[in-house]
Regions:
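Active-site proximal loop and beta-alpha junction motif in alpha/beta enzyme cores
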Residues: 1-44, 51-110
């Protein structure tokens, strides 16, 4: 992941995130993500998972409206509609949510 993240082709934009996708079955993929800023593999990345699922569905001409995702952070589903021109819309990411932190901050406004 780091090798791609720092590749010179992405220097002008400050590097890139990198998603590795493996087909599990026709409608399920496994995704691992190396994230810029974190500089390591993360448990999950919503934008990377969504983009990977749409790219996978498009490349494989899937006739369904969702792709199942296995990520280190848990199992997810990406739902979408594909119109007659081949455009994807109404894209949703579904998965379990868990609060991992709560806090507050006091702002001093003048």
């Amino acid at each position: 992941g780091a090798k791609i993240r720092y590749d010179k082709r992405f220097q002008t934009i400050g590097g890139t995130n990198c998603n590795f996708v493996q087909q599990i079955d026709k409608y399920t993929i496994k995704i691992r993500t190396y994230e810029r800023g974190v500089e390591n593999e993360t448990l999950s990345c919503g934008t990377g998972i969504t983009a990977s699922a749409i790219a996978y569905a498009h490349k494989n001409n899937l006739e369904i409206d969702n792709v199942a995702i296995n990520a280190k952070g848990g199992n997810l589903k990406v739902f979408f509609n594909k119109d007659s021109q081949g455009n994807y819309n109404n894209v949703f990411l579904q998965g379990k949510a868990q609060e991992v932190f709560a806090g507050s901050i006091e702002l001093f406004l003048e």
